[in-house]
Amino acid sequence: MSLEEYFGDWIRVINQKELNIAIDAMNRLYSSKKVCPAAENVFRAFDLCPYNELKVVFVGQDPYPQKDVATGILFGNRADVPEDELSPSLKVVKEAAVNFEIPHNSIIFDQTLESWARQGILMINSALTVEMNKVGSHTMLWRPFIGSLLKNISMSNPGLIYVLFGSQAGTFQPYIQTGTVIKVPHPAYNARTETKMNPELFTGINRELKSKYGITIKWYKEY
């Protein structure tokens, strides 16, 4: 399968030279190291988020470095993970997105976060792979690809919302030429310090989307 066939419309904003360099490095790493996520999930965020429906870009640090945790979707966990065993970062994100401080009926929260991606959020890390148990180990490998990706997206799609989670993601702000850029602490920081992520992040995104496009993101289902 060619890159054009695999990435579909995303190929418009992907620097194929940088991508090929990263893929060559990936092939070497996966054959000699333990790497997260599974190779078939590295580009999963692009598969789930339709390019023509892109509204928001979330950028984190790197995938969960523990075995069988990373899914290729920023902050997402597998559907079969018990609620009390969710990753600390996802617990922080869930609490802010649902905002349990306001009244709710019963809710369903998609812990895979695939539903967010399908609604037009590109959910990527600033490094798409990581060596198992070695946080930040592939940061420089992916930086050229992610940098050019963000620049090309912003030039081709004015008016998007970009959320940069943590200091590493924040270093990519100069690549973003248009749109709204929001910088917030990484939820891992909130988990470590036992602080909360501000729910205004999610309500603010929806206010802007409603104002610009007349739509909002359904962060959870309520019934």
Task: Identify the role of each PLM range.
Residues 1-4:
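GGW-centered surface loops in extracellular recognition modules
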Residues 6-164, 168-176, 180-183, 189-192, ...:
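A polyanion-binding, active-site-adjacent surface
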Residues 213-215:
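Short, charged low-complexity linker/loop segments at the C-terminal edge of domains
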